Amino acid sequence: METKAKKKWKTPHTFVILVVIILIAAAATYIVPAGEFTRFKDAATGKTLVEAGSYHRIASSPLNPLKIPSAIYTGIVKSASTITFMLIIGGAFQVITSTGALTALCKKLSKTFSKHKYVVIPVFLTLFSIFGFTMGMSSEVMIFVPIGITLALFLGLDKVTGTAMIALGAAVGFTAGLLNPFNVGVAQDIAELQLFSGMAYRVFILVVLLAATSAYIICYARKVAAHPEKSVIYGIPEDQEYTFDNATDTITVRQIAVLIVMALGFGILIYGLSKKGWYFEEMSGLFIFMGVICGFISGYGPSRIAREFGEGAKGIIVGCLIIGIARTVEVILSDANILDTIVYGIVNIVNVMPDSIKAVGMFLCQSLINCVIVSGTGQAAVTMPLMVPVSDLVGISRQTSVLAFQLGDGFSNSVLPMSSSLMGYLAVSKIPYSKWLKFMMPLFLIWTALGCLFMLGALIIGY
């Protein structure tokens, strides 16, 4: 009698993982008591802040299990701006990619770096960290992911490496937050500190994080280059847009014109983000314009441009749905009025910790809070009015409490399925979340350990 072979464990689809998290959140509405903080609008900044010591219980309003599908719909609707932006990015980049200009450029670059291919990793990380620590760019840099992937594949690396050197560069820069108005700027304002003060220590943190992240990605890339089967995405069929069997060594005049349009477009994008306060609406308009112009330059008719755009948008629809479904967790916790209770409970953990480890505890608790309040600005508005009094009582500087917030908010965004920026990167790159997590978890643990050391260092130097 033949024995049946054991079925190999397969990681569930990202939809399944998110639905499990949603069910846990729904169950929590029956267990966690409802409560809320009193909020007020700060006249000086116009921001809605939490009043310290104002938490109070209110009547429970647990979620009816039959309304979970409706909550998913609400999560998708509330993510509409992000989803629309991603669909437009997917469509526009498909038009641009189909011209062959991007492939030709990356092939030229790969030849330039062929003898020093691993140098590309720290160079890209550093470049995109600048976008992160100056303009607070995170989800916005997903537009550069196809370039990183194409270059990485030409260098004999994998899509994960190409995605990581773009996404993690922005993540490191955003977290270090030298001049980031969305985490450090908001938190320091609430903590009544001089804007962007404490710069020197944040520069040190940036350098250490860039070095650690570069070393980790290079080690992974070397392993994949030597043994392709060790790639975390080995065995997954390659996407058609990242196959280069017909790539040539020459760049046509039309392709050069497309690259010029792209360069001008990215220049306008950076100007708009830094000087005009652009967001998804303006960026979407720019990329529609770029895609159409590049299509016409390449000799495409309107119908060909439309077909390519549709194919590109279709290719990332699953990733777009993931972003909306992930938003459902926040919708459930907020509607049931248990979000503030969870934050209140986590902050109280810091209060009962020994003074010697309170700084590290503040960082770890901010990381936990980021699981339910993924928005950096939103997290600052809720937690900083609570953490500042705690730090004042135990003799920890307000600058250190801001540091705890920025590290706690920044690191976990690269692993949480609720992070719209992470899901955006993965949607564009078509890397399954489970595979990314396998690659990212060791680095996340390294970041967390470094975060604890940064907090201890802040205490030692009197930051």
Where do the language-model regions lie?
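Alpha-helical transmembrane segments and, especially, the helix-loop junctions at the ends
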Residues: 91-92, 129-145, 153-202, 213-218, ...
